[in-house]
Amino acid sequence: MDQIQKVAFQRVFKTPGVKNQVADIAKKASWTPLLSAADGTKVTCSPNLNAPETTPGEERTFGDGNEVVGGIPISLGSSPTEFAAVIRRQPQSVIAQLKKMMCEEVGVYIFDINGMIGCLADNPSNPTKYEPIPIFSMFVGDYSFGGYDGTGSNNISWKFKPNWSDNLVFVKPQDFNPLTDLVNPDSDSSSEI
């Protein structure tokens, strides 16, 4: 997957205990009802994401020297993966809508520069259902003035749990480009929420 350009947010659970899943994620017809939904299945597309950076979690360890056998640290797993980007030149009403998701249990479908969709699958080698990648500690920052040589912007960031990518798959859409064809209802463009 290449540069992330947009994401689609969706609640992880459509109802308590029942995960959101899409059977045929490669067809636009699967997305259309999700964009206009008024329940827990609703999908909301982000504006364009600039300067996206993903920092994979580093190993967490315990001990050294005489504290552990042979002085070899004990591996405890990994820390979360961090994602950060910048949203430029968007009305603050769009940003306010994104901020409402900061206290929701949401996930993301990732759209790259080539229109590929990144998401989780029930079985990565033979997927039958796809779901959003859960995110945590979502943050949407206040407006930053751009100055003479820049543009106004808002920072956005979140974390993925350790091992988040174990069931990650990349899907090529069959009849649409998610960057241009998935538009939030009542929007003049795909960059508005």
PLM segments and residue spans:
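Solvent-exposed edge beta-strands and adjacent loop segments
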Residues: 1-84, 133-150
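Short acidic, glycine/tyrosine-flanked loop/strand segments centered on an H-E-D-like triad
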Residues: 82-89, 115-142
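Short, acidic/charged, Gly/Pro-enriched secondary-structure junctions
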Residues: 95-129
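Mixed-charge, glycine-accented linear interaction segment located at domain edges/termini
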Residues: 129-193
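Oligomerization/assembly interface segments of phage tail-like spikes and tubes
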Residues: 69-95, 149-166
